[in-house]
């Protein structure tokens, strides 16, 4: 359980702001290293730094709420939060529902297997006849279902622990973004390996409700994102947490 002092810090970021500052309610899972995670009772990561930096520029405060990833979209739709900072990939279905900021992470979908199996499963084409895990509510399930051989893949959805079940051999592979996959392999003791190159480019951004209030907030934060991109702040946050700059398209 989070310590009370730390919990208070999570719920209201202490910034010296004018009395007219708005509170931006930000939803995240708190379990997607290195973007949003809890360590020593403190919520931290790429997304936390990003939202704090945006709020500092716009003169707002940030109120973080953690919940299961699969519940984030519903929380945004119902008005319980104002946006989601959890590597939300822009997809046609999501664009039909929400207004998105400009992308701030460019990445790719990655197959990950138990260490030693990367010679047998060499990428997405090797997933025929395999059981593959994805996080419930993520866009990676849809990417797999759009493959021409999707009916040959047993797709299994998880709230969490896809890495552990892959390492234990309960599933043959999992699919996640390449950046997070590489960080999990680097930081955790689990015997995992990347299997082949990314098989789909993804662009991640902040979603907002497509109403007057949501659009106004999107435009305000988008302007701050442009400033952070221009002055190197986005790059610095990326290099701090990932060791490389993923805030611009590859190439």
Where are each of the predicted segments found?
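A conserved helix-loop-strand patch within extracytoplasmic ligand-binding domains
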Residues: 60, 89, 102-154
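A ligand-binding cleft/hinge motif common to bilobed small-molecule-binding domains
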Residues: 71-74, 86-96, 143-147, 168, ...
